[in-house]
């Protein structure tokens, strides 16, 4: 899916599920905001929230997961805001600018996401 600005419908990034396992009800999610001027403005967090809602409510997924390098603190903060939890790390996975960086594993489970979004879901069903 494309990530676009509301003001002028400018294409600024992408978000996608990768490798949905229908048998197990899980998938990886990937996101990228290409133009650095649009990073840190909530577009990624908003896109991830919409994607999680779609995956959990429409595709009936039980688990959505992603990996992120430890140097990408802005992304980690965004994923935590969207409902992800850190579940592990692979230490020293990447050499970047002479420093070793960890690969962080994050996921959100259906029941966790539902608990975090109960008020929003109730309001949506009352409007329908």
Predicted segments — roles?
Residues 26, 57-67:
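Conserved GNAT acetyl-CoA-binding A-motif
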Residues 65-68, 85-105:
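Conserved catalytic-core motifs of GNAT/GCN5-like acyltransferases
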Residues 1-38, 109-111, 122-124, 128:
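Acetyl-CoA-dependent GNAT
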Residues 9, 42, 72, 98:
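Conserved G/P- and acidic residue-centered "switch" motifs that form tight phosphate/ATP-binding loops
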Residues 22, 44, 48, 99-102:
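Short, conserved glycine- and acidic-residue-centered signature motifs
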Residues 40-42, 115-121:
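Short, charged, solvent-exposed linker or helix-capping segments at domain edges/interfaces
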Residues 34, 40-54, 73-81:
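Conserved acetyl-CoA-binding loop-helix of GNAT-fold acetyltransferases
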């Amino acid at each position: 899916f494309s990530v676009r600005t509301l003001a002028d419908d400018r294409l600024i990034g992408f978000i996608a599920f990768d490798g949905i396992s229908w048998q197990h009800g899980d998938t990886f999610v990937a996101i990228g905001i290409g133009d650095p001027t649009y990073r840190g403005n909530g577009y990624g967090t908003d896109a991830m929230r919409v994607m999680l809602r779609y995956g959990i409510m429409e595709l009936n997924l039980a688990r959505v997961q992603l990996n992120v390098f430890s140097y990408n603190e802005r992304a980690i903060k965004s994923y935590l805001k969207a409902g992800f939890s850190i579940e592990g790390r692979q230490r020293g996975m990447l050499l970047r600018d002479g420093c070793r960086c960890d690969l962080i594993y994050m996921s959100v489970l259906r029941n966790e996401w539902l608990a975090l979004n109960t008020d929003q879901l109730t309001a949506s069903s009352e409007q329908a």
